[in-house]
Amino acid sequence: MNVKVESEKVGLKLNIQKMNIMASGPITSWEIDGETGETVSDFIFGGSKITEDGDCSHEIKRRFLLGGKVMTNLDSIFKSRDITLPSKVRLVKAMVFPVVMYRCESWTVKKAERRTIDAFGLWCWRRLLRVPWTARRSNQSTLKQISPGISLEGMMLKLKLQYFGHLMRRVDSLEKTLMLGGIEGRAGGEGDERG
């Protein structure tokens, strides 16, 4: 398939200077009409960072940075004595956690990242209470004062389960077939023999 020809059929004109590709194979360079395009190892698509190797740890770190930025922007509200603690907790749940959890349904969370998720949630609550990092205060006492109900990791798990339920309720979909292991074929490439 020629990308340029197919694009022109629907009235699109390609601008090579604005175009990048991320290849899953051995493509190192590409060109259209003699102009060479750039091959990248990662890019932002739909608000998420897509990497060549499919690892989501970069996206998780990126989401924590974005969530931390939102948390910092809310500092003036957290300092206000006119706003009650339950209202501040609801603000964090409504404005910070959704930024962090965006598209978390597709993440493969490892043990180290799970600890980081817990640490970020506790960092948010300690920042909300204005507890300095040097203070010798237990995480349990912080959680007891906030009483968040469900942890950040628990919220992420809930979203994953909701998405899984959505996929399982669909009648005929590729996603459901993949989840149920219904794709026939061999594992591995040419010459891969299993005894």
Predicted regions and their residues:
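Short linear motifs embedded in intrinsically disordered, charge-biased segments
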Residues: 1-195
